[in-house]
Amino acid sequence: MDASIGDPRLTSVEAAFEKNPLPGFSWLVTPRAMAVAVLLGIVFCFVGMRIQMMTGFVPALNMPVTVLSFFLLKVLARQLQKWRLTVVPFTRQENMFLITCVITCLNLAITGGFATALTGMGTIVAKTLADDLDPRDIIDYIPTGKLIIYFFLIGMAGVLSNIPLNQIMIIDYQLLFPTGSVIGHLINSFHTPEGAYIAKMQVMTIFKVFFGSFSWSIFQWFYSSGSGCGFSSFPTFGLELYKRRFYIDFSATYIGVGMMCPHIVNFGLLFGAIISWGFLYPYLETKHGEWYQTDSPSNLDGLNGYKVFISVTLIVTDGLINFLILVTSAAINFYHIRQQQQQTSGLASYISKNPSMNYDERKRIEMFLSSKIPMFVPVAAYVAWTAISMVAMPAMFDQIKYYHVGVLYLAIPVVGFCNTYATGLTDWSVSNTYAKFSPFIFAAWIARPGAIVASLLVSGITMASLHVSSQAMQDLKSAHMTLTSPRAMIAGQVFGVALSSVVSPCIFRAFEKAAKPGAPLGSKDSVYPCPYAGLYRAICIIGMGGVKGLPKYCVELCVIAVLVTIAIDALVLVSQLKGWRLHLYIPSMTVIALPFFAGSYFTLDMCLGGLLLLLWKKIDTMSAEILSAAVAAGLICGEGLFTLPSALLNMFKVLPPMCMKFLPSGQEVEVVDSFLNSSGGTVPKT
């Protein structure tokens, strides 16, 4: 049998593992893998949710998950074998089961709506958009038990809607799923001596940087007693630019995120911050009394209306354009694949008719087909799950009705196919675009008090189910490349959903407790501002027809934003079709739009991270390629994990001993000195 891939001189991957027998189901779904999954699930949910609540988006954490999963499970397996508690060998298949558990857990945590839809239901976010609130459109507290049930319902909807597509996407259409392919190659390499050495080096780097980041967070904490205190409020470029939110807050998280994001994303964010906070908003402030009258920073009929609706317009327009491009591309590719299939009468028969197919592909397809699940099982399960959700969702949230849930669950498999197919082609899930468009439709459909909460629920269900589904297919691609049973992967996805359903609501409660007094979670002054929460709520308001109360020329500026977005996206598309390089230097309009609403401070930290990586690559390219993701993960995890002791200190009323704050010279210092003297304190004279 031919054991080569393309070029006979190249060694087959599966031939290298030929001596290792394929493990059974019980050797894949092991208690030790589940134990490590619980540990890593908690850590990465904590870190991922924290980043999302701080910045509005989460960089790809698949690589840190993959490296740490391999390292921790290998160490645990070796110790258990040393203590003679098990004879089960550590295999790449068990490694893949662990990875899909953790990634599914993380994906559900960051797409379930904690930083978007669920936070957007509360009074804190609602007051940033209006002063006169309808209590039927407000939910300030959702019991933890309800959150657990809600997350399990939407997570399982994503898993069940994905299963019927497994063979179609992986075998019939042979889609690439780039991230899944990379992880598959990585796992295969890790289970060789050379790959294990690199993995060990990466893990050591993560722990070293983690310790430094954690220590830096402790040091910063001592100077942060009070609002606007500490290094996070350091006026790097002076107090005037600080008022415009242009400063470096020395956040290891943002620097790490900047190292993981492409340079075009980092500088796109900075460009958006300069355009909005540097030019547009100062100009609009000069129109106070002419274009708008209110001084309220939250009302949509004031300056806030421009901020919210211009940013929403940019994001939604860019998302819809990219969605149309992806759907068109997917339809064209789908047509060509169907034409090829009609000529070959299906891939299964193609295997038997083409004995020259390389050894790796034949081996992988045989494994996949031998352990696939009959189609009627997931279809029947999804129908039953839809019925359960139609009863459970309205019982927990009376703003949404059973027929709203039924229509949404009917659309999820159809839209999920489009989203997963596009992910297989481009590695890009547009679930967030669907999550912005669906509440607009449902808000217009419901159009009565309570519609905002119902539409936000629709947004959360849409994003979580579609994203979990598409990313589960990425994991299945990795499983296909490592000869891991699809049934074991589905078991891992179910376990990941169950784990996330319990862990992520508890972590969310910890973040609520950790928020500083006077700056609760979701507020603009909070450590966790959840910048997208207001945007999602604003989309629901627009859907209900609430644009009539906007300030003067707001709609016209939104139309200009639409036209600019169309022009930029058209230029990018033409550049791609013509083979120019111009599109490589044009950032996404969604990236540019984020600072319009969230502020500009984090963009400088991210650019700093990107510049550090660029400098590192100039000095030592190989070291940067191997270890940069590990350094970024250490920076993010170190600061992220300090949130736990910080929250505990806050719960027990243990406050930092000092406040480092910067004030302009003159009368302000005298006022502060007078205040401190009346309180028994003093400002040291210099």
UniProtKB/Swiss-Prot annotation:
Coiled coil feature spans: none
One CC-aspect GO term: membrane
InterPro entries: OPT, YSL-like
Role, per record: May be involved in the transport of nicotianamine-chelated metals.
Name of the protein in its database record: Probable metal-nicotianamine transporter YSL4
One example GO MF annotation: oligopeptide transmembrane transporter activity
Main location: membrane
Family of the protein in this entry: Belongs to the YSL (TC 2.A.67.2) family.
Signal peptide: none
Entry's transmembrane regions: 27-47, 53-73, 96-116, 151-171, 203-223, 264-284, 308-328, 373-393, 405-425, 441-461, 488-508, 554-574, 596-616, 629-649
UniProt cross-references to Pfam families, sorted A to Z: OPT (PF03169)
Compartment(s): Membrane
UniProt membrane topology term: Multi-pass membrane protein
Keyword field contains Membrane: yes
Keywords assigned: Membrane, Transmembrane, Transmembrane helix, Transport
